[in-house]
Amino acid sequence: MIIIPQTKGGVGKSTVAMQVIAPYLYKKHGKKITYIEIDDENNDSKSFTRTEIVNKKMLGTNRLTELDELILMDDNHEVIVDVGGNNTSSLVLDEIKKVGSFGNIKWIIPLGDGELDGKNAIATMKKIKKIEKNPEDNVIFALNRAISMDEDYYNEQFINFFGHKYLDSNSVICDFVKDPKYFPVKNDKVITMSRYLGSTVWEMAYNNTDFAAKAIQAKEMGDIESARKYLFFRRIQTEAKDYVLNTLNKIFYDLDRWIDIKK
């Protein structure tokens, strides 16, 4: 099971869950993944109306005991749990603590580059340490909305994670974890586009529709507006492929080292 908590809202938990972890697990297992969203206030996954890589399920905070059996049984990471921010994450972590993780959970803590994001990521990590026997092996950080995938750049962007020798940066993640596992998630407009299209970037990249051929056909039929539409989708498809190649595949490589999935 992959659980994605953060006690702060607005850090992109659903982006990490749907755009990164869902396609990764789908690709590894070759089948739809169970995607559970726990949030009494928001339902971010409802944007993904056309996705074919997950089976979505909402779970209210009044039904958290249903996680007990799922955690015990899912020893091969076929379930993603996207946990809402604020009190929801704290409540879920407190409930899981009562039963334990059975060594079956990988925790992914997302954070942006803001100071408060870092402090809440530390608070979330401390709660997980009360559950996990091996937090160093099982906790991974997602540096969300990275401006660049260049290491030197995101090292300076995420001062709340790495710290900075010339800037005042008290209480950063690396003060609490000696060698943290992490991956940057590059911000890109194609992520926004994918939500409006009801799909994930990964699925958009592997859409077999030949939009170039459709544009040519529309032009030959004199339907210029349709030709423009197909050119638009052709561009998005290309940008999605670039995002998979330059961002997602790099993350998947790291996840392969950290997450053991039995074939």
Which residues make up each language-model segment?
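Switch II (G3) loop of P-loop NTPases
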Residues: 76-93
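Conserved catalytic-core segment of NTP-binding enzymes
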Residues: 88-183
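C-terminal lobe/tail of nucleotide-utilizing enzymes
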Residues: 140, 145-263
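Short beta-strand-centered segment that lines the nucleotide-binding/catalytic pocket of NTP-utilizing
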Residues: 26-44
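Structural motif
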Residues: 3, 80-82, 108
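Walker A (P-loop) phosphate-binding motif
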Residues: 1-24
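Glycine-rich, highly charged phosphate/nucleotide-binding loops
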Residues: 58-69
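P-loop NTPase switch/communication element
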Residues: 41-56, 159
